[in-house]
Amino acid sequence: MLALHGLTGHGKRWEPLATQHLSEIAVAAPDLIGHGRSSWAAPWTIDANVAALAELLDHQATSPVVVVAHSFGCAVAMQLAAARPDRVTALVLLDPAVGLDGAWMREIADAMLASPDYSSPEEARAAKANGSWADVDAAVLDAELDDHLIPLPAGRYGWRLSLPAMISYWSELARETVLPPNGTGTTVVRAARTSPSYVTDRLVTDLRERLGPDFRLTTLECDHMVAEAKPADVAALIRERMR
């Protein structure tokens, strides 16, 4: 299984799901470009990530894999499936953020530029706990800060990521959606508490028209961090695509 995190995330976020719920499955969860301990060098595009992941699969995977992805990672996953159908057998897409409104993406990018960091770890934790991580177990949130929050030179704190890369990626989310090829089993999970919803009606319609019976849409009662909030449910959906 290949697991792809969302924008501003990192691969280690998948560790609780992999070790506690999918321990019998081999999981690769790399940091995407500009995130975590991956290269921060440009280009910061979906295409560059697809090329890097295809190379990873060519060197490491002995057979086609199920790709599980979250948010921005879903855009990468779908384009990877389209570019390399020989390497991708199925997709599980958790609250996918793809083909979104450009004006909305500009608002989010502007907000990130205006407030990119925090005065303390406590402020960083509160920002997540009062936002899309509100329904995630406190221990998982603590691990996120331990793994991903770093001190900055000016005495503030920020996530282990390249800010220029993040701004570029918000634009990438407004690109036209690249759909997986016919025959790709695809499960989309809509997070019921994400408002406004990232999962657009157009995405659902386009996937249903392209994939027919190979497409499944399900809704989970959680906020945007689906794998962290509902790991058992996500693990069950992944196993369905591995049969």
Where are these regions (language model features)?
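Conserved HGGG/HGGXW glycine-rich cap/lid loop of the alpha/beta-hydrolase fold
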Residues: M1-S39
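Active-site signature of alpha/beta-hydrolase-fold catalytic machinery across serine-
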Residues: P16, Q79-A83
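Active-site loop/oxyanion-hole signature of alpha/beta-hydrolase fold enzymes
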Residues: A26-V68, A236
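Gly/Ala-rich beta-loop-alpha elbow adjacent to hydrolase catalytic centers
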Residues: A69, G73, A77
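Flexible "cap/lid" loop of the alpha/beta hydrolase fold
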Residues: A82, T89-E122
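Conserved alpha/beta-hydrolase catalytic His-Asp/Glu region
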Residues: S119-A174
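Conserved loop-alpha-helix segment in the C-terminal half of the alpha/beta-hydrolase fold
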Residues: G185-C222
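Catalytic histidine-centered segment of alpha/beta-hydrolase-like enzymes
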Residues: L220-P231
